[in-house]
């Protein structure tokens, strides 16, 4: 049934999402625990960036080349349906979905994930934070509290993502809107658990509660950006319907309308990022900006699962 198919596909995506964040956080923590040197873990970030460049860019180009090539040969030249087994390029198209949307996406977000925690640790290690008697910072297990806080936020995000996957369920005969909301429930549930864990960590460490607010701002900003992207790309909403309507007058107007829509869709994410940076800097300085990025990426495990589940379900439908 539909619920069973959703569970299988999403569970497969969750394996990839949790693996990416788990390996990333574990690598940074082990390296910093062994060497106690921010420069060493910076090298870990450089390695992740180099792999992400090739996997994301190279994989993305291959994905689109295979997709367009398969459509040109099949639908345009031969007049056969998409994903038809008579078209050999269908295999390249299915493989391309995995290369670009799973492997490439995973490498890209792996780099962003480890880069955010490395930057936060480097800020503390470089001593750019002004600490006085009213803001004492002690060590726990050999880690500075301000270094341990982002690690705990991300660790709680991994567990929250695992628990959030159990919230993703639907009923038979569900509409596309129902399926999208089932995914949102998992993401929102994971975000709520991260906030609870962050509040407990800040309270336990006896730190300023402003650190909790910057994590909250990061989470909210991430959700707004994701919702904005969905609004401009989902066929349920007006923007894509307007682009489709332009097809009545020919392909040229579709290209123009689509390009214009893509440009205007960047406005909300840009404004949200600027506002979030201003608020977090006002609350906790440079460290607050870095910690808000940690909050934004804390639920990456389940967010990445929703990205990876798409190609899995798509290829299953093609088979």
List PLM regions with ranges.
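Hydrophobic packing and interface segments
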Residues: 1-319
């Amino acid at each position: 049934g539909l619920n069973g198919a959703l569970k299988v596909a999403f569970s497969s995506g969750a394996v990839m999402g949790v693996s990416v964040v788990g390996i990333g956080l574990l690598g940074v923590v082990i390296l910093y625990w062994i060497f106690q040197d921010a420069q060493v873990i910076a090298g870990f970030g450089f390695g992740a960036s180099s792999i992400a460049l090739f996997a994301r860019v190279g994989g993305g180009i291959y994905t689109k080349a295979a997709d367009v090539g398969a459509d040109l040969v099949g639908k345009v030249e031969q007049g056969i349906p998409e994903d038809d087994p008579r078209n050999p390029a269908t295999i390249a198209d299915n493989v391309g979905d995995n290369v670009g949307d799973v492997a490439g996406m995973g490498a890209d977000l792996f780099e962003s994930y480890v880069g955010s925690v490395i930057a936060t640790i480097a800020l503390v290690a470089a001593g750019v934070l002004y600490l006085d008697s009213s803001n004492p910072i002690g060590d726990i297990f050999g880690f500075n509290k301000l270094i341990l806080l982002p690690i705990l936020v991300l660790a709680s995000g991994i567990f929250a993502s695992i628990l959030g996957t159990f919230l993703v369920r639907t009923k038979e005969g569900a509409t596309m809107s129902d399926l999208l909301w089932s995914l949102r429930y998992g993401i929102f549930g994971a975000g709520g658990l991260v906030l609870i864990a962050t509040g407990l960590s800040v309270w336990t460490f006896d730190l300023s509660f402003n650190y909790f607010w910057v994590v909250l701002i990061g989470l909210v900003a991430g959700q707004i950006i994701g919702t904005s992207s969905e609004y401009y790309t989902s066929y349920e909403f007006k923007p894509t319907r307007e682009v489709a309507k332009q097809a009545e007058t020919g392909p040229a107007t579709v290209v123009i309308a689509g390009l214009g829509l893509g440009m205007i869709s960047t406005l909300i994410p840009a404004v949200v990022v600027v506002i979030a940076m201003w608020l977090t800097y006002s609350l906790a300085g440079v460290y607050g900006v870095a910690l808000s990025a940690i909050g934004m990426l804390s639920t990456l495990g389940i967010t990445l699962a929703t990205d990876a589940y798409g190609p899995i379900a798509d290829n299953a439908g093609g088979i």
